Design a protein with these regions (language model features):
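Helix-loop-strand module that forms the ligand-binding subsite of alpha/beta enzymes
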Residues: 1-73
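Glycine-rich phosphate/pyrophosphate-binding loop and the adjoining helix
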Residues: 63-119
């Protein structure tokens, strides 16, 4: 699931919603959003976390982008990396997750392509 800090951020964006009173009302509308998640094991909840973030994007009328349909094991909703079976530094473990990094790269490419289509 999403972290407490991310949930807190999401809750504080109420002023950006359609019924908000902020000068930034609709501030996230039509923005492109792609999701990344890191978990302790492959397919151990990263997909559900990404879906929660995508639901937030949809509430704000954002354009949700996934990592594409390229045939690869991993997550198609966004970028999903794992730290398993590495112990120690999370960054080093993620850098060894070739499948997760591929899904994250695919997501970045798809976000860039979507932005180019909107120009």
């Amino acid at each position: 699931s999403i972290s407490t800090q991310l949930k807190q951020f999401m809750d504080r964006t109420e002023g950006l919603l359609r019924y908000g009173t902020s000068q930034y009302q609709y501030g996230l509308q039509d923005k492109v959003g792609g999701c990344l998640a890191v978990g302790g094991n492959r397919n151990a909840g990263e997909e559900l976390t990404i879906l929660e973030i995508q639901a937030f994007f949809q509430v704000h009328d954002m354009l949700v982008v996934g990592s594409g349909g390229e045939p690869t094991p991993g997550c198609y909703h966004g970028g999903a990396c794992t730290t398993y079976p590495q112990k120690g530094d999370v960054r080093d473990a993620i850098l060894q997750d070739e499948i997760g990094l591929k899904s994250a790269r695919n997501l970045g490419i798809r976000v860039a392509k979507t932005l180019n289509m909107l120009k």
